[in-house]
């Protein structure tokens, strides 16, 4: 097992060279941004047959195969990245329009279809005049950067007996905390949600991570699918009712206009009392399984919590997130073995929600996330590491960005273009009291210390 870890250490060795000299000037200057982005809106990864096993009622039909980026997902990404370029322009990193200078963008995507197509949509929105290209892993099998355990780069996560008990306790607490949402899912879908659940810890040589099976896994997956449906067919979903304002104050005129369109009477969706004689009625709503956006957001914490518990768990995060975090850090420092990434003002990795959860778990980063559950990663979410230079040195800062819910729940191009991105500034571990950032060398050292974790397993 140790030889696997030594392969990963080779990636981390790129952090060791001396960090270049500090920049001149008093005002901090944004020198570089490294982004880890989730792919855009996709269809469920489950097959129609798998979805049919969850409920006797039909599900809406998608016009792409399971797990593929949809046309609407690509559209949302284009608008999101058009806005993001304007934000970077305001910060002085890149020009607001025109063809990008050669070498200013390094875009690397996981090789599967939904991430590659997401990268294409990102380019179309960010630099429609050209000036960028998409890079992917050329070898056989899965990309070791995004799938280090499955590809064999890193060993399977090994959980101690205490860590296993802790995970089970967290899942039990989740079931108590989200009892109302789980009951709602049970009434929507039927007995599949009520099946017992179990955690499966990987054996050495299986190239797997920790997995959840059973009713709680079904509930978690279904909660995500219901949200994806709302984002794919927002008009249809909003016809079911629900208020999606999320309690935000000081809305812009364009956001107020959006919410006037989206607001509707209280949901016509009500859950009958569950009884022993009739634990799961065949129908709660007529027609395909679908809920309003408000209901979807109330159910989503089931999925977000399961994701957090499994993917942020230390052994899982180390095995699955350490190589990617090491590469991102080395690019910030300008010491990676990829000269194009070192020289680029903006580096973007297009991966998956699990990648963001793994890296955020290693850095102990958390976000409130507005209308969405805390720490959740809606389609297109971005975990951003930025490098700021001043006469006092180089500082790394972190933030979380995503498209606004108002943009996700409209088909109006004006709204999608004009509603600002949702942003949260995050606090890095060991950060100073101002701005939540860390000196670059201290941040690199902190990442290096993470290598001690799997070496002890």
Cite the ranges covered by each PLM segment.
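Positively charged n-region of N-terminal signal peptides that target proteins for export
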Residues: 1-3
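Bacterial N-terminal signal peptides
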Residues: 7-16
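Sec/Tat signal peptide C-region and signal peptidase I cleavage site
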Residues: 19-23
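Signature for phosphate-centric chemistry
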Residues: 24-104, 110-347, 351-457
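Short, solvent-exposed loop/turn segments at the edges of secondary structure
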Residues: 5-8, 378-380
């Amino acid at each position: 097992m140790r030889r696997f870890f030594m392969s990963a250490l080779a990636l981390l060795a790129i952090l060791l060279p001396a960090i270049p000299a500090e920049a001149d000037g008093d005002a901090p200057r944004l020198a570089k941004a490294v982004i880890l982005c989730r792919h855009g809106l996709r269809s469920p990864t489950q097959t129609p047959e798998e979805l049919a096993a969850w409920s006797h009622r039909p599900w809406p039909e998608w016009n792409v195969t399971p797990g593929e980026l949809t046309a609407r997902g690509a559209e949302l990404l284009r608008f999101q990245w058009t806005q993001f370029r304007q934000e970077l322009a305001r910060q002085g990193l890149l020009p607001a329009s025109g063809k990008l200078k050669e070498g200013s963008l390094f875009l690397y995507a996981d090789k599967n279809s939904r991430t590659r197509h997401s990268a294409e949509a990102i380019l179309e929105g960010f630099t429609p005049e050209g000036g960028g290209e998409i890079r992917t892993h050329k070898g056989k099998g899965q990309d070791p950067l995004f799938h280090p355990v499955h590809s064999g780069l890193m060993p399977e996560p090994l959980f101690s007996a205490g860590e296993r008990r802790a995970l089970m306790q967290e899942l039990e607490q989740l079931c108590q905390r989200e009892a109302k949402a789980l009951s709602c899912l049970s009434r929507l879908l039927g007995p599949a949600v009520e099946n017992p659940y179990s955690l499966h810890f990987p054996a050495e040589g299986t190239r797997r991570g920790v997995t959840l099976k059973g009713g709680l896994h079904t509930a978690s997956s279904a909660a995500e699918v219901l949200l994806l449906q709302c984002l794919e067919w927002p008009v249809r979903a909003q016809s079911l009712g629900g208020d999606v304002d999320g309690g935000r104050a000081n809305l812009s005129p364009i956001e107020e206009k959006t919410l006037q369109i989206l607001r509707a009477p209280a949901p016509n969706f009500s859950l009958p009392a569950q009884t022993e004689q009739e634990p799961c009625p065949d129908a709660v709503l007529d027609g395909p399984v679908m809920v309003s956006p408000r209901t979807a957001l109330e159910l989503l914490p089931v999925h977000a919590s399961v994701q957090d518990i499994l993917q942020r768990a230390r052994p899982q995060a180390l095995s699955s997130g350490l190589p990617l975090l090491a590469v991102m850090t080395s690019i910030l420092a300008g010491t990676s073995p990829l000269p194009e990434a070192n020289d680029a003002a903006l580096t973007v990795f297009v991966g998956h929600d699990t990648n963001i959860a793994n890296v955020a778990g290693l850095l102990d980063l958390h976000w409130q996330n507005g209308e969405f559950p805390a720490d959740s990663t809606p389609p297109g979410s971005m975990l951003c590491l930025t490098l700021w230079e001043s006469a006092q040195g180089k500082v790394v800062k972190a933030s979380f960005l995503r498209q606004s819910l108002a943009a996700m729940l409209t088909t109006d191009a004006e709204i999608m273009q004009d509603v600002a991105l949702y942003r949260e500034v995050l606090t890095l571990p060991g950060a100073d009291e101002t701005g939540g950032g860390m000196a670059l060398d201290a941040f690199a050292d902190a990442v290096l210390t993470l290598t001690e974790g799997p070496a002890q397993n």
